[in-house]
Regions:
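Per-ARNT-Sim (PAS) sensory domains and their PAS-associated C-terminal
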Residues: 2-5
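Compact sensory input modules in signal-transduction proteins
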Residues: 7-9
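Conserved post-Walker A coupling segment in P-loop NTPases
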Residues: 67-143, 200-205
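Conserved D-loop-proximal element of ABC-family nucleotide-binding domains
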Residues: 117, 147-148, 181, 206
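Conserved ATPase-coupling elements of RecA-like P-loop NTPase cores
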Residues: 145-153
Length: 278
């Protein structure tokens, strides 16, 4: 609704005991931040978004055998990267929800959507997330910045010590060979970032039957359907496909298959037709 509330707690001694005076400041935002790529959410919203997604439903992160404790314990900036599609923003939301700063906001900054108003707010406003303290920032599409914008943004981060006062996450897409945009190599060096690679679906195709079963059960409840699973040959067809769009494509294909199936088991013909359209 365009209203922002800022809370500040100040410790004081009163009658021999430590008390906290909380002040609440109400202000109206001058621009609609979400329209320009800056969005705020809290821990509960992040948890709900994650567990309502394919990745939360299927627990596909555990399937990928990722060890996350080292990333939770460190305060260093983290680059989460991988092929397009394998759950990078969802991973950040899970790390935020499990991390020590989950009582403060998660601030998502999409550099591809900033445009002039968002960029001006980020770089010049005294309410910029870069000026904050004790928050979690997730920046995506850094490659959309010009070289000049990139230099200005990260010079500002370094000057304000944003990376020391907050937890920074960067979401990056890489090629199948693992190559990322040069901006990410620079920020890794500048900010001494940790790296977390999200494995593509093709690296554990053997898990497709289990993942399919879990997600189909949820789709049945959402859509009042009664699909049990795949015919054996259809299962084989799913595991032999390369899934270039990774989990996002896999999720979309399952949505279509369940929607258009009128029998208890999804046939191999239905699967082949859908994959041809991919």
């Amino acid at each position: 609704n365009g209203i922002r509330y800022a809370l500040q707690s100040t410790p004081i001694q009163m009658e021999g005991a430590l008390r906290h005076v909380v002040t609440i400041e109400k202000s109206r935002l001058s621009i609609p931040l979400e329209k320009y790529g800056i969005a705020y959410s809290d821990r509960q919203q992040a948890v709900d978004t994650f567990f309502d997604s394919f990745y939360g439903i299927t627990q596909s992160f555990s399937t990928a055998n990722l060890t996350l404790e080292q990333y939770l314990q460190s305060n260093r900036p983290l680059v989460v990267y991988g092929d397009p599609g394998p759950a990078k923003p969802q991973m950040v939301q899970m790390l935020y929800a499990k991390g020590p700063l989950s009582n403060a906001p998660l601030i998502k900054i999409d550099c591809a959507m900033l445009m002039h108003p968002g960029w001006k707010y980020l770089m010049a406003s005294d309410r910029s997330p870069l000026m904050g303290d004790g928050c979690t920032l997730m920046m995506s599409h850094v490659e959309a910045l010009t070289d000049e914008q990139f230099s200005e943004l990260f010079s500002t981060i370094m000057a304000l010590h944003t990376q020391e006062r907050n937890r920074l996450f960067f979401v990056a897409s890489s090629s199948s060979s693992g190559t990322m945009h040069p901006h990410y190599a620079r920020l890794v060096d500048m900010l001494n970032c940790l790296m977390l690679q999200m494995p593509p679906l093709r690296s554990h195709l053997q898990d497709i039957p289990r993942l399919s079963g879990l997600y189909i059960s949820t789709l049945n409840m959402r859509n009042a359907r009664a699909v049990i699973g795949f015919e054996p040959e259809a299962n084989l067809c799913m595991t032999e496909y390369s899934w270039p769009g990774n989990y996002d494509q896999f999720c979309r294909v399952l949505d279509e298959l369940v929607l258009h199936t009128t029998t208890p088991y999804i046939s191999v013909e239905t699967v082949r037709d859908q994959l041809k359209r991919e």
